[in-house]
């Protein structure tokens, strides 16, 4: 059966259409040396430098693919500069911090790139009890984390939806000293509309599901057995999640599995599809790369991308989907993460453990890790590093709890109004962290940064309110103040 490209369709074969992607790549090859076309495409993006006063059209997946294929040094430098400037216009210098929490590595799937695959007899299988989850969360709160992304393999017997829901309730219930987890994002396998409704009722933050690869034939090869082997079921999951009432969804591909140009086009088409059908694009886009792990050698995948191209992909996602939050994890090294922050990344993990029960172990356990962690710094080290670069480490979760989600969040973000909330909230939550958890030198330079950043809050009333909230945090012990 032949399929035609239709971004408004609910059929994965139509909104991620193979023929359209191949035609897109051919178009990009035909025009990659047309420097004037490339600059004209970049010019279309410039209204996004002023989101409060101008509403520029998004460039298409074809136009973005031309830019990706372009090898002209001047164009590539212009791409990075524009991406930096657009990120500043939408998100400023704030960097949201989070941590993953692995609940269970039981899995019935056979993904060839993941050590949790069912045939791996070497990995110890483990599932956290609710008491163990409490201990993990207390350890995370004692670091200073306020936002978690929970992860679990797909296993109806060991990890049913009831286990995920109970775990979310446990996480939200824990208030240790001044600690609290205020937003729980969920990264679990594609499921039904009814189960998405249950996650919504349990106060999910963002539902995250990595596509892994948009190449259907490659997807089938990489997922030979298990529920995840159904490409359409997996690819159409975000539509079911939004039908189930989940406002915020997060996309991502695992770069290195298939051609990065194919994946990039598919990722942008998925974002276009969500906009076309639901009026709301992805709340976040993640950019993981295949990394070593037990039973996994990334060198067997011959589509790896060098750091320079990886940075260009990040920059082009920022230009093409300017409103989205962009996430990079501790899969990447400090050096790569530092450069990625310039070109579009707005969220990073810190102090992460990618093993089940990893936060309460004295020594870092490697035998249950999903992937090797490249950036092994503590959360305080990451916060200190961000401050040194004049980034504002943010632990804010205010939008989610104030109802600024889905189309409401997007209207604030696309108009630039979100800056009136996010910047002050970032400063208040940073003050919480510096008061409760930071090392003395981190605290000292962090409060100096807050003083400098307060002067950048343009609205005089909001600047005064922000200063008062910070004072209440530091001197009165108040917590969870937000705008």
Question: Where would I find each of the regions flagged by the language model?
Answer:
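Canonical Radical SAM [4Fe-4S] cluster-binding loop centered on the CxxxCxxC motif
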Residues: 91-92, 96-132
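Core AdoMet radical
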Residues: 118-134, 139-242, 247-257, 279-286, ...
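Generic structural signal for well-ordered alpha-helices
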Residues: 99, 137, 165-172, 196, ...
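An N-cap/entry alpha-helix motif that binds or orients negatively charged groups
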Residues: 50, 54-95
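Conserved C-terminal portion of the radical SAM core fold
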Residues: 152, 206, 232-296, 306-335, ...
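Short glycine-enriched, charge-decorated loop/helix-capping segments at active-site entrances
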Residues: 222-228, 299-303, 368
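Radical SAM enzyme core and accessory elements
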Residues: 1-47, 52, 338-346, 352-483
């Amino acid at each position: 059966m032949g399929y035609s490209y239709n971004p408004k369709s609910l059929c994965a074969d139509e909104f991620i259409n193979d023929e359209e992607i191949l035609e897109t790549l051919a178009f990009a090859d035909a025009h990659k040396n047309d420097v004037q076309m490339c600059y004209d495409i970049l010019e279309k993006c410039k209204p996004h430098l002023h989101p409060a006063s101008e509403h520029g059209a998004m460039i298409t997946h074809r136009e973005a693919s031309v830019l990706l294929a372009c090898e002209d040094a001047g164009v590539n430098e212009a791409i990075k500069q524009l991406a930096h400037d657009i990120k500043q216009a939408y998100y400023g210098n704030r960097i949201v911090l989070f941590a993953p929490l692995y609940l269970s590595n039981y899995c019935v799937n056979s993904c060839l790139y993941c050590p949790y695959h069912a045939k791996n007899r070497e990995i110890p299988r483990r599932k956290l009890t609710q008491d163990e989850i409490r201990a993990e969360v207390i350890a995370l709160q004692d670091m200073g984390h306020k936002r978690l992304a929970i992860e679990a393999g797909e296993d109806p017997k060991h990890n049913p939806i009831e286990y995920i829901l109970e775990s979310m309730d446990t996480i939200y219930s824990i208030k240790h000293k001044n600690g609290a987890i205020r937003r729980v994002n969920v990264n679990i396998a594609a499921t039904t509309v009814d189960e998405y409704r249950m996650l919504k009722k349990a106060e999910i933050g963002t539902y995250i599901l990595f596509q892994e690869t948009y190449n259907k034939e490659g997807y089938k090869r990489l997922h030979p057995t298990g529920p995840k082997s159904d490409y359409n079921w997996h690819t159409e999951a975000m539509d079911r999640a939004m039908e189930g009432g989940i406002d915020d969804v997060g996309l991502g591909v695992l770069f290195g599995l298939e051609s990065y140009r194919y994946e990039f086009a598919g990722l942008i088409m998925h974002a276009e599809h969500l906009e076309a059908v639901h009026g709301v694009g992805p709340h976040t886009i993640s950019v993981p790369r295949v990394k070593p792990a037990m039973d996994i050698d990334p060198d067997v995948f011959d589509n790896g991308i060098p750091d320079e191209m990886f940075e260009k992909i990040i920059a082009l996602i920022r230009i093409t989907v300017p409103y989205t939050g962009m996430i990079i994890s501790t899969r990447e090294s400090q050096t790569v993460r530092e450069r990625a922050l310039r070109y579009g990344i707005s969220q990073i993990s810190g102090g992460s453990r990618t093993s089940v029960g990893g936060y309460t172990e004295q020594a870092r356990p490697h035998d249950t890790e999903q992937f090797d962690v490249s950036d092994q710094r503590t959360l305080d080290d990451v916060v200190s590093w961000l401050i040194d670069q004049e980034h504002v480490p943010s632990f804010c979760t205010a939008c989610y709890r104030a109802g600024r989600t889905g189309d409401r969040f997007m209207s604030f973000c696309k108009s630039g109004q979100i800056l009136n909330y996010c910047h002050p909230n970032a400063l208040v939550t940073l003050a919480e962290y510096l008061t409760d958890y930071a090392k003395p030198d981190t605290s000292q330079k962090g409060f100096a940064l807050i003083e400098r950043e307060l002067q950048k809050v343009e609205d005089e009333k909001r600047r005064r309110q922000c200063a008062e909230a910070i004072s209440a945090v530091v001197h009165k012990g108040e917590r969870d103040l937000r705008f």
